[in-house]
């Protein structure tokens, strides 16, 4: 099927590549179907709405930038996403891309969790955590 995207123009996708967010994403509850589209020659991935071309979130796998990042998924999330083990899970965080790019932040408090085998996803809001919605990707470049 052909879809229009925010960053990649019109592209062809396969039904099997669609990730279903049964509850939508907070702030976008009606959006339930997304695809993951790598941005060529970057570590970034676009979580692109299948139905709304202008809706694409910039993601990263957090461990390259935040090597000690760790979360515990509650039983409800494990059940919703039909997760049986770590091999089922892909974990991403949403970026707020800034200008200059050195000011870009990652939302570590609300990761995107995807069951890669069942193609089910959810944005998980972490509670009782020290993670915030804005962690700088490049903390060493903070202005003095």
From Swiss-Prot:
The keyword Calcium does not apply. It is found in: Cytoplasm. It comes from the Bacteria. The keyword rRNA processing does not apply. Keywords: Bacterial flagellum biogenesis, Chaperone, Cytoplasm, Translation regulation. One of its GO terms (biological process) is bacterial-type flagellum assembly. GO terms for cellular component: cytoplasm. Its main location: cytoplasm. InterPro entries: Flagellar_assembly_factor_FliW, Flagellar_assmbl_FliW_dom_sf. NCBIfam families: PRK13285.1-1. Monomer. One copy interacts with the each alpha-helical wing of the CsrA homodimer, yielding a FliW-CsrA(2)-FliW complex. Comparison with a CsrA-mRNA structure (2JPP) suggests CsrA cannot bind both mRNA and FliW at the same time. Interacts with flagellin. Belongs to the FliW family. Acts as an anti-CsrA protein, binds CsrA and prevents it from repressing translation of its target genes, one of which is flagellin. Binds to flagellin and participates in the assembly of the flagellum. Allosterically inhibits CsrA binding to mRNA in a non-competitive fashion by preventing CsrA binding to the 5'-UTR. This is Flagellar assembly factor FliW.
């Amino acid at each position: 099927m052909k879809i229009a995207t925010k960053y990649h123009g019109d592209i062809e996708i396969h039904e099997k590549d669609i990730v279903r967010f049964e509850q939508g994403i907070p702030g976008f509850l009606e959006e339930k179907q997304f695809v993951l589209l790598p941005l060529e020659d970057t570590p970034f991935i676009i979580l692109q709405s299948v139905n709304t071309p202008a809706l694409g979130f910039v993601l990263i796998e957090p461990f390259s930038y935040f090597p000690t990042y760790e979360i515990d998924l509650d039983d409800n999330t494990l059940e919703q996403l039909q997760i049986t083990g770590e091999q089922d899970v892909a974990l991403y965080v949403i970026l707020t891309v800034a200008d200059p790019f050195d000011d870009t932040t990652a939302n570590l408090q609300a990761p995107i969790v995807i069951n890669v085998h069942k193609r089910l996803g959810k944005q998980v809001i972490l509670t009782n955590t020290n993670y915030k919605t804005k962690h700088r990707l490049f903390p060493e470049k903070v202005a003095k």
